[in-house]
């Protein structure tokens, strides 16, 4: 019998998976370092037997490693830091991860981050897409860049309005990232409402769970897309939207149902499928807990097997 007053309980397997798997490319190393940072901050929620000895040094080591994967144009590459090998999605994801690491108290070198932001700003304003990016994929990746840059006040209401017509092209992951961007930019409340409604229109609800459905072509694998990653990005954005909008929000109990869907997707493995899913899902559970688990629970949990009291 496992009982926990928080959705963050029972996630030991995700940390074990990220701790033990051998990582080689920048995305994997960055995800592992960020997950180690989460481990340090969430230690009271985790089993005492779960030990990650390198967790105290790994986040800083990972940040310092970033320059080895940064191309001259400021973008990030999986292996070789050359302009022609830069991945727009990986670059936007790196900027997001830097934000998460900074929120956890880590310092990000200004030279690396500023070059990265300059690349992303150019990416937003010019046609710098790889040939294999469809227009829909490009719109979704731009949304990730907007979400990352909004944290630093490097985009404004006019930028949001400029990209709003492209929301219809974005997949649900992109829509969730665009919603996250709008929530950080003053004067975009109506746009936030519109995007939230577009996301909610894809919800398929049952009595206890919810799923968000869409069709994608195989090209989205180039930006590491998966249904579960999308669901986790939606949970983060809808939780933030619900918190900000208060009584105006139409979200209802969807975040609660979405948490159930996400946690059950681990099945018997204790973790999700890959680095992207484990990190986005962990972030989503943290974001959910921050909004909906603010109050300390007052409860007593007891269990019986037939008439025998277990505890």
Regions found by a protein language model. Name each.
Residues 1-136, 142-153, 157-160, 176, ...:
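Extended, solvent-exposed functional surface patches
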Residues 135, 140-311:
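Long, domain-scale non-catalytic interaction/scaffolding regions in large secretory-pathway
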